[in-house]
C-alpha cells in the first residue's frame, strides 16, 4: 500500500512532467504546420510568378506576358483567370482608396476612383493618391506648422466654405477617444475649437441642423421637432413622411439661399431642408437624401464639385453623415458600436482632408466640423409612465426625452384643450418625480421654446437618462437618445474649424449654435438675413473679422427726476411708524437730494459699466439717484425699469438683517400721477408690492429709507416674494462672498405674448385690465463680477463674469414643489433652472448693458451671449 507521503508528493510531480510533454508536443505540432504553410506559400508564389499577374493587364484581350492564365473578361467563364484577377481587376474597382497594389494601375472605367499614373491629369484620383502612390506626407501626419500660410490656387478668389456635420457627435467623445480619431483630433489641434457647441432645445436632429444654417431658434424657423403637428396646415410632420418635403414647414432663410440671393453658388450633399424648395428655390447643386450612399461617395462627389470650372463651382458646401448618432441610438454612447462609428467618420473626414491637400486646397478652404447634438444612455427602468398619473389617457403625447402633450381630437379641440389641468395633474405628484411639467410660456426663457403654434402647450422637462411616455407598451429604451435640456453635458456637441480665415491652435469658450449662421456669412463675405444670433460674437475665432459690431443706439433718453420739494403733495396712502412728523419726513427726503459729487460717486460704485441704455422708442424714463443704488424709472409703468447697485464682499455670509416694518413713503421726485399707490394690491390674484432694490442691503440704519419709497415698488405675487426675498437676503450675500463682490441690475419683464421680446406699451395696456399697474411676466437679475477675483466690480480692469436670471413671475411656487421644504432646499435650484444670457435679458427688456466698459464691442458680445450652466455630470 502506498504511503500518504508518496500520494502527496510523487503524483503531482508525474502530472507536471506529463503536462510539460504535452505543451512541447503542441508547440512542435504548431511549428510543423507553420513550416508546411510557409513551404506551400513559397511554392504557390513561385507558381503565381511563373503564371503571371493581372497588374496593368486587367481586361486586356492579349496574352502578352501571361503564362497559363488570362485577365480578359471571359477568364472567369473559362476558369483560367490569373491568381490576382479578383483583387486587381474586380475588387480594386469597388474601393475609394489607393494602395500600393493599385498604384500605377491600368485605367478601368468601372473604378470608383483611379490610382493610375494619369489620374491627376484626368482629375479622378482617389483622395489619397498622392500620399499612397507618390510618397507625399499625408495630411494627418503633417505638422501644424506646414499649414499656416493661407494659399488658394488660381481661380479661387473667395476661399470656399465647407460645413461638415457628424450627427450625434457629443463633445465628450473627442475628449475620451481622441487617439481613435486622429484626423479630427488633428483639426482640433491645428485649428480653432470650442469646448463644446450648445445645441438648441429640443436637442434633436432636424431642429438643430436647421438652426445651424438659419441662425434661428426652432420656435422661429418652425422645425420645432422631428415630429410635430401644425393646426394651420392641419398636417403632421415626421422624418418618415413625404410631408417633410413641403416647403410650408420650413421658415426662415437657410445659408444656401442667403448665398444664392447674393450671387454665390452652393452645393449641398445632404442637410435637413436642402432638398426642399424653401421659398421656391433649391440649392444650386443638391442631392436628395439617401442614407444608403456611402460616406466615401459623398466625399468624392464634393471633391469633384471643387474641381468644377470657376463659373460652375460652388462657393459654399454642406456635407452630412449619420454617424455616430445611429450607433449611439443602437448601443448607447459608451459602446463598441460608437467607437467603430467614430473611427468610420474620422476616416471619412481624413479622406476629405487628403482630397483637399491633393488639390492644394487645405490652406484655401475654410472648413467647419460640427454636430447637431450629443447623446445619452437610456434605460428601460428609467421611464415615467403617464398611465401612473392619469386613470385614463385621453390625450396625444410626443414621447421620449422632450415630451409634449396635446389633444387627440385635432383640429377640433386644439385650442380648447385644457392644458392647465394636465400640468396641474402632473405637478408635484411624487417625491422622486423625474420630470417637471410646464405650460410653454413658463418654460425657462433660455430654451426659446414657446412662440410657435407647433409647440404644444404642455411640455415636460425630463431628468437626464429618463424618458416620459404614455404607458408600458413603450419599448424604445436601453440604447441611447437625445432631445434633453440643452444644458445637459451629454447633449453638448463638437465645433472645430480650420482654414485661412480661422485662428490656429486656439480654444474658445462654448457658444450657442445660433451663432454659426452669422459666422458662415462672414466667411462668405455676405450680409446675413435677420436671425437670433448676435453678429460679431464669434469674431474671436477669426484672424481678421469681416464684420465689426457696434453698441446699439439708445432710442429713448433718460432725464433726471430731480429733487424739488422736501414733502409730498400726495401721501399716496403711504405711512411709516418711524416717521411721524414732517421734520422726520423732511430729514429722510433730503437724503434723496444728492450733490453732483455724490451722484458721481454713486455712478462709479453702482453703475461701474455705465447705465443700461434703453432701446425702446417713445419712452420718457428718468434716473433716480441714491447713495446705495441707481434706478431708471418708467413713468408710464409707474415702476422702475431697472435698479443697479453693487454688493461688496461681506465679512460673513449671514443673511441680511430685517428692515423697518410697515414703513413706506411717497417719492417726492416723482409726480403722484406717475407713482404707485402704497395701498395697491390685487387681492383676487394674491398680488401685493415688493421692492426691486432690497432695503435690507443698507450700509447704515438711515440708508434703508432710500429704498422704502414708492419709486422702488414693483407688483409681486406673495409666493414669488418668498423666493425673491430669500434670493436677496441669502443667495446674493453668498454670490458676493464667492466673487469678491457683485454688481446687480434687476427689473421687471413684460412678455405677455411669450415671444422673447419686450412688449410694446399698447400690448402691455391690453393685458393690464382693471389695474393701473401692469403685472410683469418675469423679473430679471444680472450679476456681474470681475473674472479676476482679486478685483472688485467697480475696479475691474479685465474681463467680466456674469450670472443672469430670468425668473417667471407666477402665483405659486409649484414648479419647485416647496411644500414642507425650507427655502434653502429649492430657491437656488429654481434660479439655476432659469439662468439666461445677458442678451436674453436685453431682448426681453429693451435694455442694452456694458456700453461704458472699456473693451472691444465684440468681446462685450461674447460676455452677453455667455450662458452659465450648473450641470457637471455626463
Swiss-Prot record:
<dbReference type="GO" id="GO:0006220">
    <property type="term" value="P:pyrimidine nucleotide metabolic process"/>
</dbReference>
<feature type="binding site">
    <location>
        <position position="167"/>
    </location>
    <ligand>
        <name>Zn(2+) 1</name>
    </ligand>
</feature>
<feature type="disulfide bond">
    <location>
        <begin position="113"/>
        <end position="126"/>
    </location>
</feature>
<feature type="glycosylation site" description="N-linked (GlcNAc...) asparagine">
    <location>
        <position position="279"/>
    </location>
</feature>
<dbReference type="InterPro" id="IPR036024">
    <property type="entry name" value="Somatomedin_B-like_dom_sf"/>
</dbReference>
<dbReference type="GO" id="GO:0047693">
    <property type="term" value="F:ATP diphosphatase activity"/>
</dbReference>
<keyword id="KW-0479">Metal-binding</keyword>
<dbReference type="GO" id="GO:0004081">
    <property type="term" value="F:bis(5'-nucleosyl)-tetraphosphatase (asymmetrical) activity"/>
</dbReference>
<keyword id="KW-0862">Zinc</keyword>
<dbReference type="InterPro" id="IPR044929">
    <property type="entry name" value="DNA/RNA_non-sp_Endonuclease_sf"/>
</dbReference>
<feature type="glycosylation site" description="N-linked (GlcNAc...) asparagine">
    <location>
        <position position="236"/>
    </location>
</feature>
<feature type="disulfide bond">
    <location>
        <begin position="58"/>
        <end position="89"/>
    </location>
</feature>
<dbReference type="GO" id="GO:0070667">
    <property type="term" value="P:negative regulation of mast cell proliferation"/>
</dbReference>
<feature type="glycosylation site" description="N-linked (GlcNAc...) asparagine">
    <location>
        <position position="532"/>
    </location>
</feature>
<feature type="binding site">
    <location>
        <position position="373"/>
    </location>
    <ligand>
        <name>Zn(2+) 1</name>
    </ligand>
</feature>
<feature type="glycosylation site" description="N-linked (GlcNAc...) asparagine">
    <location>
        <position position="425"/>
    </location>
</feature>
<dbReference type="GO" id="GO:0016324">
    <property type="term" value="C:apical plasma membrane"/>
</dbReference>
<comment type="function">
    <text>Hydrolase that metabolizes extracellular nucleotides, including ATP, GTP, UTP and CTP. Limits mast cells and basophils response during inflammation and during the chronic phases of allergic responses by eliminating extracellular ATP, a signaling molecule activating these cells in an autocrine manner. Metabolizes extracellular ATP in the lumen of the small intestine, and thereby prevents ATP-induced apoptosis of intestinal plasmacytoid dendritic cells.</text>
</comment>
<feature type="glycosylation site" description="N-linked (GlcNAc...) asparagine">
    <location>
        <position position="770"/>
    </location>
</feature>
<keyword id="KW-0812">Transmembrane</keyword>
<feature type="disulfide bond">
    <location>
        <begin position="428"/>
        <end position="817"/>
    </location>
</feature>
<dbReference type="GO" id="GO:0047710">
    <property type="term" value="F:bis(5'-adenosyl)-triphosphatase activity"/>
</dbReference>
<keyword id="KW-0067">ATP-binding</keyword>
<feature type="binding site">
    <location>
        <position position="759"/>
    </location>
    <ligand>
        <name>Ca(2+)</name>
    </ligand>
</feature>
<dbReference type="GO" id="GO:0047429">
    <property type="term" value="F:nucleoside triphosphate diphosphatase activity"/>
</dbReference>
<dbReference type="GO" id="GO:0046034">
    <property type="term" value="P:ATP metabolic process"/>
</dbReference>
<dbReference type="GO" id="GO:0008270">
    <property type="term" value="F:zinc ion binding"/>
</dbReference>
<dbReference type="Pfam" id="PF01033">
    <property type="entry name" value="Somatomedin_B"/>
</dbReference>
<keyword id="KW-0677">Repeat</keyword>
<feature type="glycosylation site" description="N-linked (GlcNAc...) asparagine">
    <location>
        <position position="686"/>
    </location>
</feature>
<feature type="binding site">
    <location>
        <position position="226"/>
    </location>
    <ligand>
        <name>ATP</name>
    </ligand>
</feature>
<feature type="glycosylation site" description="N-linked (GlcNAc...) asparagine">
    <location>
        <position position="677"/>
    </location>
</feature>
<keyword id="KW-1133">Transmembrane helix</keyword>
<feature type="binding site">
    <location>
        <position position="757"/>
    </location>
    <ligand>
        <name>Ca(2+)</name>
    </ligand>
</feature>
<feature type="region of interest" description="Phosphodiesterase">
    <location>
        <begin position="160"/>
        <end position="544"/>
    </location>
</feature>
<feature type="glycosylation site" description="N-linked (GlcNAc...) asparagine">
    <location>
        <position position="788"/>
    </location>
</feature>
<feature type="glycosylation site" description="N-linked (GlcNAc...) asparagine">
    <location>
        <position position="290"/>
    </location>
</feature>
<keyword id="KW-1015">Disulfide bond</keyword>
<feature type="disulfide bond">
    <location>
        <begin position="561"/>
        <end position="622"/>
    </location>
</feature>
<dbReference type="GO" id="GO:0002276">
    <property type="term" value="P:basophil activation involved in immune response"/>
</dbReference>
<feature type="disulfide bond">
    <location>
        <begin position="103"/>
        <end position="133"/>
    </location>
</feature>
<feature type="binding site">
    <location>
        <position position="372"/>
    </location>
    <ligand>
        <name>Zn(2+) 1</name>
    </ligand>
</feature>
Amino acid at each position: 500500500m502506498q504511503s500518504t507521503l508518496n500520494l502527496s508528493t510523487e503524483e503531482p510531480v508525474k502530472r507536471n512532467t506529463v503536462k510539460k510533454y504535452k505543451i512541447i508536443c503542441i508547440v512542435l505540432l504548431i511549428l510543423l504546420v507553420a513550416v508546411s504553410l510557409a513551404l506551400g506559400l513559397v511554392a504557390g508564389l513561385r507558381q503565381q510568378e511563373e503564371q503571371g499577374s493581372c497588374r496593368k493587364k486587367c481586361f486586356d484581350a492579349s496574352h502578352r506576358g501571361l503564362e497559363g492564365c488570362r485577365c480578359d473578361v471571359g477568364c472567369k467563364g473559362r476558369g483560367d483567370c490569373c491568381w490576382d484577377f479578383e483583387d486587381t481587376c474586380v475588387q480594386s474597382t469597388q474601393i475609394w482608396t489607393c494602395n500600393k497594389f493599385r498604384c500605377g494601375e491600368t485605367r478601368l472605367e468601372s473604378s470608383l476612383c483611379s490610382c493610375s499614373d494619369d489620374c491627376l491629369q484626368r482629375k479622378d484620383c482617389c483622395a489619397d493618391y498622392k500620399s499612397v502612390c507618390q510618397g507625399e506626407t499625408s495630411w494627418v501626419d503633417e505638422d501644424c506648422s506646414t499649414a499656416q500660410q493661407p494659399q488658394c490656387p488660381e481661380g479661387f478668389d473667395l476661399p470656399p466654405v465647407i460645413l461638415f456635420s457628424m450627427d450625434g457627435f457629443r463633445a465628450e467623445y473627442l475628449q475620451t477617444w481622441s487617439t481613435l480619431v486622429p484626423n479630427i483630433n488633428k483639426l482640433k489641434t491645428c485649428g480653432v475649437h470650442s469646448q463644446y457647441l450648445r445645441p438648441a432645445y429640443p436637442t434633436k436632429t432636424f431642429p438643430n441642423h436647421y438652426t445651424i444654417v438659419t441662425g434661428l431658434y426652432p420656435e422661429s424657423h418652425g422645425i420645432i421637432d422631428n415630429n410635430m403637428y401644425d393646426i394651420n396646415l392641419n398636417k403632421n410632420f415626421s422624418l418618415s413622411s413625404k410631408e417633410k418635403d413641403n416647403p410650408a414647414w420650413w421658415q426662415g432663410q437657410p445659408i444656401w439661399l442667403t448665398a444664392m440671393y447674393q450671387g454665390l453658388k452652393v452645393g449641398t450633399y445632404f442637410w435637413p431642408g436642402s432638398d426642399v424648395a424653401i421659398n421656391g428655390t433649391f440649392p444650386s447643386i443638391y442631392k436628395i437624401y439617401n442614407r444608403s450612399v456611402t460616406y466615401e461617395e459623398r466625399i468624392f462627389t464634393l471633391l469633384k464639385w471643387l474641381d468644377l470650372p470657376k463659373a460652375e463651382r460652388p462657393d459654399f458646401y454642406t456635407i452630412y453623415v449619420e454617424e455616430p448618432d445611429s450607433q449611439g441610438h443602437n448601443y448607447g454612447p459608451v459602446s463598441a458600436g460608437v467607437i467603430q462609428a467614430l473611427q468610420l467618420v474620422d476616416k471619412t473626414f481624413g479622406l476629405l482632408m487628403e482630397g483637399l491637400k491633393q488639390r492644394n486646397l487645405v490652406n484655401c478652404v475654410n472648413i467647419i466640423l460640427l454636430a447637431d447634438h450629443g447623446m445619452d444612455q437610456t434605460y428601460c427602468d428609467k421611464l415615467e409612465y403617464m398611465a401612473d398619473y392619469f386613470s385614463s389617457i385621453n390625450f396625444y403625447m410626443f414621447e421620449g426625452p422632450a415630451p409634449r402633450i396635446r389633444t387627440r381630437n385635432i383640429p377640433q379641440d386644439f385650442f380648447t384643450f385644457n392644458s392647465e389641468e394636465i400640468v396641474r395633474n402632473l405637478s408635484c405628484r411624487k417625491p422622486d418625480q423625474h420630470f417637471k411639467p410646464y405650460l410653454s410660456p413658463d418654460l425657462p426663457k433660455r430654451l426659446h421654446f414657446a412662440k410657435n403654434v407647433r409647440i404644444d402647450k404642455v411640455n415636460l422637462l425630463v431628468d437626464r437618462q429618463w424618458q416620459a411616455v404614455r404607458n408600458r407598451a413603450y419599448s424604445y429604451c436601453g440604447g441611447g437618445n437625445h432631445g434633453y435640456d440643452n444644458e445637459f453635458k451629454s447633449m453638448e456637441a463638437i465645433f472645430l474649424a480650420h482654414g485661412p480665415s480661422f485662428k490656429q491652435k486656439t480654444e474658445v469658450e462654448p457658444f450657442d449654435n445660433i451663432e454659426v449662421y452669422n459666422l458662415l456669412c462672414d466667411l462668405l463675405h455676405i450680409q446675413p438675413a435677420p436671425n437670433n444670433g448676435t453678429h460679431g460674437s464669434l469674431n474671436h475665432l477669426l484672424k481678421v473679422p469681416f464684420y465689426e459690431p457696434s453698441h446699439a443706439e439708445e432710442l429713448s433718453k433718460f432725464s433726471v427726476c430731480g429733487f424739488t420739494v422736501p414733502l409730498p403733495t400726495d401721501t399716496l396712502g403711504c405711512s411709516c411708524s418711524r416717521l411721524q412728523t414732517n421734520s422726520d419726513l423732511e430729514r429722510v427726503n433730503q437724503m434723496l437730494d444728492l450733490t453732483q459729487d455724490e451722484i458721481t460717486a454713486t455712478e462709479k460704485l453702482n453703475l461701474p459699466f455705465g447705465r443700461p441704455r434703453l432701446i425702446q422708442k417713445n419712452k420718457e424714463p428718468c434716473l433716480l439717484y441714491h447713495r446705495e443704488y441707481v434706478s431708471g424709472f418708467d413713468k408710464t409703468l409707474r415702476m422702475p425699469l431697472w435698479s443697479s447697485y453693487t454688493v461688496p464682499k461681506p465679512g460673513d455670509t449671514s443673511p441680511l438683517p430685517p428692515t423697518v416694518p410697515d414703513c413706506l413713503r411717497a417719492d417726492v421726485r416723482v409726480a403722484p400721477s406717475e407713482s404707485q399707490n402704497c395701498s395697491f394690491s390685487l387681492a383676487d390674484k394674491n398680488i401685493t408690492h415688493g421692492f426691486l432694490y432690497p432695503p435690507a442691503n443698507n450700509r447704515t440704519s438711515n440708508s434703508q429709507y432710500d429704498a422704502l419709497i414708492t419709486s422702488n415698488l414693483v407688483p409681486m405675487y406673495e409666493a414669488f416674494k418668498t423666493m425673491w426675498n430669500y434670493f436677496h437676503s441669502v443667495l446674493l450675500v453668498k454670490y458676493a462672498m464667492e466673487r469678491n463682490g457683485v454688481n446687480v441690475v434687476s427689473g421687471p419683464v413684460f412678455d405677455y405674448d411669450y415671444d422673447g421680446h419686450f412688449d410694446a406699451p399698447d400690448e402691455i395696456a391690453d393685458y393690464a385690465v382693471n389695474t393701473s399697474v401692469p403685472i410683469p411676466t418675469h423679473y430679471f437679475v444680472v450679476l456681474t463680477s470681475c473674472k479676476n477675483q482679486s478685483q472688485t466690480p467697480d475696479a475691474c480692469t479685465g474681463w467680466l463674469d456674469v450670472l443672469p436670471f430670468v425668473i417667471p413671475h407666477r402665483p405659486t411656487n409649484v414648479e419647485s414643489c416647496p411644500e414642507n421644504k425650507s427655502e434653502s432646499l429649492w430657491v437656488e435650484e429654481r434660479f439655476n433652472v432659469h439662468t439666461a444670457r445677458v442678451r436674453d435679458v436685453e431682448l426681453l427688456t429693451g435694455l442694452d448693458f456694458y456700453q461704458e466698459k472699456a473693451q472691444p464691442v465684440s468681446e462685450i458680445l461674447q460676455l452677453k451671449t455667455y450662458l452659465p450652466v450648473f450641470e457637471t455630470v455626463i
